[in-house]
Regions:
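Short, acidic, metal-binding catalytic loop of nucleotide-sugar glycosyltransferases
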Residues: 25-35
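Glycine-rich, basic loop-to-helix element that forms the pyrophosphate-binding segment
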Residues: 78-103, 113
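Short aromatic/hydrophobic "clamp" motif used to bind/position activated sugar donors
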Residues: 108
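Conserved short acidic donor-positioning loop in nucleotide-sugar-dependent glycosyltransferases
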Residues: 15, 27, 43-44, 113
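Catalytic core of nucleotide-sugar-dependent glycosyltransferases
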Residues: 174, 225, 229-233, 238-269, ...
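A conserved acidic beta->alpha catalytic loop
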Residues: 42-52, 80, 112
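Conserved donor NDP-sugar-binding/catalytic core segment of glycosyltransferases
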Residues: 121-155
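Conserved nucleotide-sugar donor-binding catalytic segment
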Residues: 141, 160-244
């Protein structure tokens, strides 16, 4: 058997044994005409996941279960407590990094254990598209979003923009401003020479993975929606509520700039409306807020003036004055369509950091 995979299928899990089985059934059922590997990274599961994976590996080793072109099924464990996580996203990022570090394929895809695929040829179709477009770093499909417990036909295609032409080539501004999709719907050309562990560590989450690889080429679109994205009440996006939701979304693009400064101007342009919305909400509350301990703990670890301010629920009088000033500046930028992002970013983070970024890219 050829031990050099062309495709690495990467799965992360945490106490999802039964859902993992559904996920693996759909993955191992893929009809691929190239060698591929499946790698499962398990973060601290105590629900029998290890035993389930050992049994599945034995079935494959003993030829009780034969999967055409499968080179190996790897099961690896990690403990996200090791990275001193401040939120669920950092735990996921640590798990994603662990599974990514085991990948050997020319291409890779991510899939979460609580999701699955609804066709048996989607990965081959994406792979063919990337082989035909060597200039592209990723091939993007859409996802099919469905609520937990509901039939697939009750779901809907996401994102909800109008359908793109099949094989359309997208450039970074398209992805960041218009068509950004779930990371799991991308097949990505792996860049093994880049040390993602040292660059991102526990911050190697879905969005950072997408943005990192966007730096290496354009994106080709496949007009399919075969990744089933199941929505649960405990999903990360569902647990962010109230002022945490407002502030974290308001500062999201600043987080992206911290790790992917190549697209700093695009991020500021995209995030300006969320920054303005955040300041509007704060102004209505008299610049008082009540963030969860989790969010405050994460902000204390993040460099920059605005993060320091939100690390505590009680702001200093001079910080309130600056917050009001920054709000006026942001509104001014929006009203007159200004693009001197270096100044606004310097106000929000610090001038030294702003001066290190090439804002003309």
């Amino acid at each position: 058997m050829n031990n050099e995979p062309i495709l690495s299928i990467l799965i992360i899990t945490h106490n999802q044994r039964d859902l993992l089985k559904r996920c693996l059934d759909s993955v191992l059922g893929q009809k691929l005409n190239v060698p591929f590997e499946v790698i499962v990274s398990d973060d601290r599961s105590d629900d029998g996941t290890a035993e389930f994976m050992a049994d599945l590996q034995n079935q494959i080793t003993n030829d009780q279960l034969q999967i055409t072109n499968l080179t190996q099924l790897v099961y690896t464990r990690c403990n996200s407590n090791d990275c001193d996580p401040k939120n669920v996203s950092e735990r996921c990022g640590w798990n994603k990094l662990n599974v990514y570090n085991h990948a050997r394929g020319k291409y890779f895809v991510n899939i979460d254990a609580d999701d699955f695929l609804r066709s048996d040829d989607i990965y081959q179709s994406q792979l063919d598209m990337l082989e035909a477009h060597q200039e592209c770093s990723m091939c993007m499909q859409d996802v099919w979003q469905v609520n937990d417990g509901e039939p697939i036909e009750n779901g809907f295609r996401w994102p909800s923009y109008g359908r793109l032409e099949n094989e359309k080539i997208l450039v970074p501004i398209d992805i960041i401003d218009k068509y950004r999709a779930l990371n799991q719907c991308y097949m990505i050309r792996r860049q093994p020479e880049v040390d993602c562990a040292s660059l991102y560590g526990k911050h190697f989450d879905d969005t950072i993975i997408t943005l990192h690889h966007l730096q290496f080429g354009t994106v080709v679109y496949l007009n399919r929606a075969d990744y089933i994205w199941v929505q649960y009440k405990t999903s990360i996006t569902k647990t962010l509520q109230g002022e945490d939701n407002i502030v974290e979304y308001g500062l999201l693009q600043l987080h992206h700039i911290r790790f992917i400064p190549s697209y700093a101007s695009l991020f500021m342009h995209e995030g300006l409306k969320d920054i303005i919305h955040m300041f509007k909400e704060l102004d209505m509350k008299g610049y008082h807020w009540q963030l969860t301990d989790r969010t405050q703990a994460a902000f204390r670890k993040t460099p920059g003036w605005i993060y320091r301010v939100f690390s505590y629920n009680q702001s200093k009088w001079y910080d309130r004055i600056k917050l009001k000033y920054v709000r006026l500046v942001a509104l001014f930028y929006s009203r007159f369509k200004l693009t001197n992002w270096k100044y606004l970013y310097g106000l929000l983070i610090d001038r030294k950091s702003a001066s290190k970024i090439d804002w003309n890219r």
